[in-house]
């Protein structure tokens, strides 16, 4: 990125979830992915910048940041978001994390909100943690916009269940969380908050600026299968 080199990038998905690769239609079978690299078409995609550090598709904090990697994929394939949320609640209860809160001020789209949160993420992917549609069904990987979901600290287990139900149904106007589409997110906290970037520990920070880097990379894709790139921009 810093060098300004514009050579197309090829992706061999070898991770646990491969959310980013699946969002742009890269096959999970490695030989097929290699064929896309050799014979595909380069297309521009957006990435994110987290206080100047680049990430591919998700920056997150809070109680649900590790559970997706421990949830059985077959269970998720069968039950989707329900499996993810059930595992998340179980893990959070076991660790006592639902008693933890992050007091954060968020600036986005000309708005300023301050609240107590148990989870938040800024993402650019058709799936997060292997769950399709978690950030909505109209995500585009190259529109200059990321999606942000921030879950308020529930006052009771009943409210927590209502929150999860609303999230599963994608009722993004529900009172339990905030949902934004933006190219720029700013976070201000009283104490350091640990974040994950693309599923890896990203450090603990107080003041955070997350920005979209539009059309940052050219990636080799199979144009017919790049679901998250319906508005493709050629090289």
Regions found by a protein language model. Give the residues of each.
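Glycine-rich nucleotide phosphate-binding loop and flanking beta-alpha elements
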Residues: 18, 128, 193
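ATP/nucleoside-binding phosphotransfer catalytic cores, i.e., glycine-rich phosphate-binding loops
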Residues: 108-109, 114, 140-143, 150-235
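Short beta-strand-to-turn element immediately C-terminal to the catalytic PLP-Schiff-base lysine
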Residues: 50, 70, 122-123, 149-152, ...
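Short acidic/glycine-rich loop or secondary-structure boundary segments that cap or lie
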Residues: 65-67, 114-116, 127-132, 156-160
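Catalytic core of DAGKc-family lipid kinases
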Residues: 2-122
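Short, acidic/polar N-cap/turn motifs at the starts of alpha helices
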Residues: 44-47, 101-103, 117, 136, ...
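Glycine-rich phosphate/pyrophosphate-binding beta-alpha loops
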Residues: 60, 121-137, 201
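Gly/Ser/Thr-rich active-site loops/lids in small-molecule metabolic enzymes
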Residues: 75-83, 128-131, 136-155
């Amino acid at each position: 990125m810093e060098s300004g080199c514009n050579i197309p990038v090829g992706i061999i998905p070898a991770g646990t979830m491969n959310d980013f690769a699946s969002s742009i239609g890269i096959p999970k079978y490695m030989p097929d992915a290699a064929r896309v690299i050799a014979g595909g078409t380069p297309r521009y995609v957006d990435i994110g910048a987290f206080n100047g550090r680049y990430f591919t598709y998700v920056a997150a904090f809070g109680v649900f940041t590790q559970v997706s990697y421990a949830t059985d994929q077959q269970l998720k394939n069968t039950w989707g978001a329900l499996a993810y949320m059930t595992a998340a609640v179980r893990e959070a209860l076991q660790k006592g994390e639902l008693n933890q809160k992050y007091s954060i001020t968020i600036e986005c789209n000309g708005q300023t909100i301050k609240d107590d949160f148990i989870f938040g993420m800024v993402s650019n992917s058709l799936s997060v943690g292997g769950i399709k549609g978690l950030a909505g069904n109209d995500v585009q990987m190259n529109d200059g916009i990321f999606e942000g979901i921030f879950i308020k600290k529930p006052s009771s287990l009943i409210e927590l269940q209502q929150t999860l139900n609303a999230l599963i149904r994608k009722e993004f106007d529900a009172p339990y969380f905030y949902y934004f589409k933006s190219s720029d997110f700013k976070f201000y906290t009283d104490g350091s908050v640990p974040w994950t970037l693309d599923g890896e520990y990203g450090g603990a920070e107080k003041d955070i600026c997350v920005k979209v880097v539009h059309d940052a990379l050219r990636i080799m894709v199979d144009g017919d299968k790049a679901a998250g790139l319906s508005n493709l921009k050629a090289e």
